[in-house]
Amino acid sequence: MRKRDKRLYHLLLVGCVLGSLSLTAQADKGIIIIKRDVQVRNATIPPLIPDPSPTTVNANPSAHVLKQTNELSDGDFAGISSGAGISNLVTQQTNNLGGNLGNQNQLPNLAGGRGTGSGNGISNMVNSSVQRGLAPLQILTGGGK
């Protein structure tokens, strides 16, 4: 058998150590160009002028941005509204609808459909649409029989 050369392993080990000690590339704080117009030109001729108004974003972490990245306090959570009071507000505003909605003679886009008490009402149309949509699931679960 051939004797292994330890110099190769030492060189490999030194390369790994030097590679791990090298400095990582850091992004510079500045402007990021998102979109710019590039002029049509030959490859050997430099562009006449660069785009005068590229779409850019300023990536400098200003004090305003850094202030927004702090943890939320209890006061911040106390100011959040869950929207639970919206339903009361909606029912208060809709109690006095001007007119009796149950006595409509005919609904639009329905031939011969009455507003209340008929089989062609909106609720029956929605119900049948939902049932047709759920039919494949009922077949899979065996509930359609």
Swiss-Prot record:
Give the UniProt keywords, A-Z: Chaperone, Periplasm, Signal
Deletion phenotype: Deletion of just fapA in the overexpressing strain alters the fibril composition; fibrils are shorter, more stable and are composed mainly of FapB with minor amounts of FapC. Deletion of the entire fapA-fapF six-gene locus shows no visible growth phenotype.
Q: Tell me the leader sequence span.
A: 1-27
Instruction: Give any Gene Ontology cellular component.
Output: periplasmic space
Protein's cellular compartments: Periplasm
Q: Where do transmembrane segments lie in this chain?
A: none
Q: Which domain of life is it from?
A: Bacteria
Protein purpose: An intrinsically disordered chaperone for fibril amyloid FapC that guards against fibrillation, pro within the periplasm. Upon overexpression of the endogenous six-gene locus (fapA-fapF), cells form large clumps during liquid growth, make large amounts of biofilm and produce relatively unstable amyloid fibrils.
Q: How does it assemble?
A: Monomer in solution. Interacts with FapC but not FapB in vitro.
Query: Per the similarity annotation, which family is this?
Result: Belongs to the FapA family.
Protein name stated in the entry: Functional amyloid chaperone FapA
Lineage, highest ranks first: Bacteria, Pseudomonadati, Pseudomonadota, Gammaproteobacteria, Pseudomonadales
